[in-house]
Curated annotation (Swiss-Prot):
One of its GO terms (cellular component) is cytosolic small ribosomal subunit. Pfam families: Ribosomal_S15 (PF00312). Keywords: Ribonucleoprotein, Ribosomal protein, RNA-binding, rRNA-binding. This is Small ribosomal subunit protein uS15. SMART domains: Ribosomal_S15. CDD domains: Ribosomal_S15p_S13e. The gene is rpsO.
Amino acid sequence: MSLSVEAKAKILAEFGRCENDTGSSEVQVALLTAQINHLQGHFKEHIHDHHSRRGLLRMVSTRRKLLAYLKRTENVRYQELIKKLGLRR
């Protein structure tokens, strides 16, 4: 399941640099985090849904790569992002 248009717009407004910013690393990580959180709830009901689990692992991998890139290039923005999203306890 994908996010609704309203949910995506809210994430874009919160994490984007401008109103049409969909490609920055922060926005991509925030969207992936929202999708991952949504799928985690799905797997509590549908334990044997292995096809969707593969998609979840792909999203986690993509998010990890984007976070590594952001940490390497813009460490301050990386720290702010993980604090906002509640990652890396």
